[in-house]
C-alpha cells in the first residue's frame, strides 16, 4: 500500500521519508511499489539529498520507470536541481499533473526552492534586473518586486533593477514566509540572460563546495 501523504510540515515530511525508506527495505524482493518510489524520490529532492535521489533512481527497475511516467517527471525536476536551473525547477514542477500522494511534496519543493533563491540573490547580488530576479524566484515580476520592497529591498522603476538588502543572520527564513503563496503561481517569466544565470549558478556552486 502507498504511504498516505501527511501534514505539510518539515517534521511530517521527515517522518514520511522514514516510512518510505522502511517500506522499500521491507518490500518483497527489495522492489517497492511505484507510489512508494515516487514519494521517496520526491522527498529526497525536497531534502536536497541528491546523492540518495540519484542512487534511488538507478535502482528503480526499468520496467517500473517505463510504466509510471510520474517517476520520470519527478526525476526531471531532480535534473534541474542538479543543474542548479532555478527557473527550470519551477517550470518542470508546474508542467506536470502530480498524483495526490506526490503533489504536496512537489509544492513544498517549489516553495523551498523559492526560499533558497531569495536567500542566494540577497547574498550574491548588489543589483539584479527585475525580470531575472522574478525568474529566479518563480513569481510574476510585480509580485516579486512588491514583496521585496516590503522586506526593505529597493527597486528602481526606471532601470527595472532590484537592489537586495543583505539579511541579518537568521532573519531571512522568517521574512520569506510571505512569499509562499496559497495558490498556484502565475506562469514563470522568461529565463534570465545567460550572464545572470551563470553568476548565480557559480555562486551556488561556491556555497556548496
Curated annotation (Swiss-Prot):
Chief location: cytoplasm
Q: Which residues carry this modification: Phosphoserine?
A: 175
**Cellular component, GO annotation:** COP9 signalosome; cytoplasm; cytosol; nucleoplasm; nucleus; perinuclear region of cytoplasm
Where is this protein localized, as stated in its record?
A: Cytoplasm; Nucleus
A GO BP term here is: COP9 signalosome assembly
Matching Pfam families: CSN8_PSD8_EIF3K
Domain (PCI) spans: 8-179
Write the record's keywords in alphabetical order, separated by commas. Answer: Cytoplasm, Nucleus, Phosphoprotein, Signalosome
**UniProt similarity note:** Belongs to the CSN8 family.
**Role of this protein:** Component of the COP9 signalosome complex (CSN), a complex involved in various cellular and developmental processes. The CSN complex is an essential regulator of the ubiquitin (Ubl) conjugation pathway by mediating the deneddylation of the cullin subunits of SCF-type E3 ligase complexes, leading to decrease the Ubl ligase activity of SCF-type complexes such as SCF, CSA or DDB2. The complex is also involved in phosphorylation of p53/TP53, c-jun/JUN, IkappaBalpha/NFKBIA, ITPK1 and IRF8/ICSBP, possibly via its association with CK2 and PKD kinases.
UniProt subunit comment: Component of the CSN complex, composed of COPS1/GPS1, COPS2, COPS3, COPS4, COPS5, COPS6, COPS7 (COPS7A or COPS7B), COPS8 and COPS9. In the complex, it probably interacts directly with COPS3, COPS4 and COPS7 (COPS7A or COPS7B).
Write down what this protein is called.
COP9 signalosome complex subunit 8
> Which organism's genome codes for this protein?
Rattus norvegicus
Amino acid at each position: 500500500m502507498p504511504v498516505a501523504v501527511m501534514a505539510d510540515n518539515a517534521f511530517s515530511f521527515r517522518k514520511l521519508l522514514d516510512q518510505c525508506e522502511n517500506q522499500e527495505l521491507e518490500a518483497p524482493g527489495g522492489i517497492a511499489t511505484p507510489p512508494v518510489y515516487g514519494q521517496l524520490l520526491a522527498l529526497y529532492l525536497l531534502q536536497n539529498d541528491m546523492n540518495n535521489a540519484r542512487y534511488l533512481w538507478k535502482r528503480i527497475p526499468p520496467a517500473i520507470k517505463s510504466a509510471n511516467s510520474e517517476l520520470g517527471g519527478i526525476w526531471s525536476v531532480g535534473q534541474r536541481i542538479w543543474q542548479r536551473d532555478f527557473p527550470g525547477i519551477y517550470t518542470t514542477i508546474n508542467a506536470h499533473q502530480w498524483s495526490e500522494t506526490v503533489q504536496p511534496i512537489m509544492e513544498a519543493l517549489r516553495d523551498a526552492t523559492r526560499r533558497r533563491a531569495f536567500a542566494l540573490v540577497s547574498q550574491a547580488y548588489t543589483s539584479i534586473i527585475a525580470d531575472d530576479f522574478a525568474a529566479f524566484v518563480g513569481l510574476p515580476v510585480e509580485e516579486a518586486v512588491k514583496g521585496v520592497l516590503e522586506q526593505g529591498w529597493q527597486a528602481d522603476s526606471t532601470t527595472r533593477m532590484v537592489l537586495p538588502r543583505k539579511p541579518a543572520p537568521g532573519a531571512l527564513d522568517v521574512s520569506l514566509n510571505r512569499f509562499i503563496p496559497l495558490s498556484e503561481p502565475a506562469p514563470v517569466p522568461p529565463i534570465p540572460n545567460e550572464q545572470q544565470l551563470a553568476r548565480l549558478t557559480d555562486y551556488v556552486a561556491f556555497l556548496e563546495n
